[in-house]
Amino acid sequence: MAGHSKWANTRHRKAAQDAKRGKIFTKIIRELVTAAKLGGGDPDANPRLRAAVDKALANNMTRDTLNRAIARGVGGDEDSNMETIIYEGYGPGGTAIMIECLSDNRNRTVAEVRHAFSKCGGNLGTDGSVAYLFSKKGVISFEKGDEDTIMEAALEAGAEDVVTYDDGAIDVYTAWEEMGKVRDALEEAGLKADSAEVSMIPSTKADMDAETAPKLLRLIDMLEDCDDVQEVYHNGEISDEVAATL
């Protein structure tokens, strides 16, 4: 998994993402409600809920807000009548893309996703067309840190792998169900991560050039603007040199 860390690939998009914070909160609340309905309201016994809580806190959601969302899910709120839908497709430059949605209307959701692909030079694929290129993992990220210290603590806590990148960033990979436990162990060792999330990790990367990179980012933005889309995963790799031109 050599290459540039997500810090290099996403830093230039931070301002645009911050502007979407209101929509992000809505999507996180929807996931909290659904996770609590399906697996109960205890994050320690519900890995999906724990991941949603971690994401909520990472985005500075208040405890009151997330606790209300969990209570709605446990209580059978109407917003909890959602189903998870995964769409797969190909983006600019042959990138493999997976889109995780929460929806109460499949027809509406697939129409919005297909529209985004068609506008940005991509194609919506069939089930299984790119899923084999991704593995569901927990990713605990440090923008900077001592590699040996983090590696020792992470592996002792049950992490699967620790990767250090050229820019000094470090990612700790875990089984997705174990991410919360490993993160807690790292914090107890005095190692506070910059982020912790469940992600779909690609086994191969597709290098983006100055022509395909902006097209890929436009597609990602269009997909993320869809109300039903929770997460967009892809295997596009944008180098520092290309990112500097965007």
UniProtKB/Swiss-Prot annotation:
Region (Disordered): 1-20
BP GO terms, sorted: regulation of DNA-templated transcription
Predominant subcellular localization, coarse grouping: cytoplasm
Cell compartment(s), UniProt: Cytoplasm
Gene3D superfamilies in the cross-refs: 1.10.10.200, 3.30.70.980
Gene that this polypeptide is encoded by: yebC
Highest taxon in the source lineage: Bacteria
Gene Ontology molecular function, alphabetical: DNA binding
Cellular component GO terms held in the UniProt record: cytosol
UniProt cross-references to InterPro entries, sorted A to Z: Integrase-like_N, TACO1_YebC-like_2nd/3rd_dom, TACO1_YebC_N, Transcrip_reg_TACO1-like, Transcrip_reg_TACO1-like_dom3, YebC-like
Native source organism of the sequence: Salmonella choleraesuis (strain SC-B67)
Pfam families for the chain: TACO1_YebC_N, Transcrip_reg
Keywords, comma-separated and alphabetical: Cytoplasm, DNA-binding, Transcription, Transcription regulation
UniProt-recorded name of the protein: Probable transcriptional regulatory protein YebC
Residue runs in coiled coils: none
Family assignment from sequence similarity: Belongs to the TACO1 family.
